[in-house]
Amino acid sequence: MKKINFIDIFCGAGGLSFSFKKRNHNLKLAVDIDPISIKTLKTNFPQSSKNIINEDIIKLIKQRKSDIFKNKIDLLMGGPPCQGFSTANRQNILNDPRNELYNYFLEFAKKINPKFILIENVVGIKTRANDILTK
C-alpha cells in the first residue's frame, strides 16, 4: 500500500493524525496554536516531533519558509475551530474571529495543492461550507 504524505492543521492533540500514523503514513506537518495540545501530540508521536509545531496558522501562512509548500502532499486535514457554528453554543459569538479560520485552512490548501482534503467540523458549518464549495 502506498504511504500517504499528510499535513494536519488545527490538529489539536492529533485525533485525526492518529489513525494515519497507526497505518505508518507520513506526517509531514502538524500545526496548532495550543501548546498543551502540541505537547500531547509530540508525546504520542516522538518520531515526528520535528514536524509538529506550535504556531498560529495565520502567521505560518504569512511568514513561514516556502519549503513547507514544496512537499508533495496527498492529504491536508484539520479541524478549524467550530465554536461559532456549534448548536451547543448558547452564546452569540457570530463575530468571533475564530469563525473565519476555515478561510485560512482553504488558503493553506491552495498553497500546497493536496490531492485530498478532509475537514472535521460541526453540522452548523454546513451553510458556510456551501458558500465555500461554490468558490
Segments the model singles out, each with a brief description of its role:
Residues 1-135:
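Conserved active-site and SAM-binding loop architecture
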